[in-house]
């Protein structure tokens, strides 16, 4: 009987943890800011740097100036 109660408790705890991870708002890795020694290359590259990875890739394909910020 104690084993069943323990297993039910562990299963419910696991479900609560999974639900919290799904609603936690985690959006992926935080992008690194550009190094301080390098001056900003312009408003277009700065805007590309703040976009999602897929949008940055699209921006780099059309505006080749942003690609080196993504590779860092």
Swiss-Prot record:
Biological role:
Antibacterial and antifungal activity. Presents chitin-binding activity.
> InterPro entries annotated for this entry?
Penaeidin (IPR009226)
What protein is this chain from? Answer: Penaeidin-2d
Instruction: Name the Gene Ontology molecular function terms of this record.
Output: chitin binding
- Give an example GO cellular component term for this record: cytoplasm
For this protein, the record's Pfam families field holds:
Penaeidin
Q: List the disulfide bonds.
A: 45-59, 48-66, 60-67
Q: Where would one find the signal peptide in this protein?
A: 1-21
Annotated keywords: Amidation, Antibiotic, Antimicrobial, Chitin-binding, Disulfide bond, Fungicide, Pyrrolidone carboxylic acid, Signal
Provide the family line. Belongs to the penaeidin family.
| Organism the protein comes from | Penaeus setiferus (Atlantic white shrimp)
Lysine amide PTM positions read 71
The answer to whether the entry has keyword Methyltransferase is: no
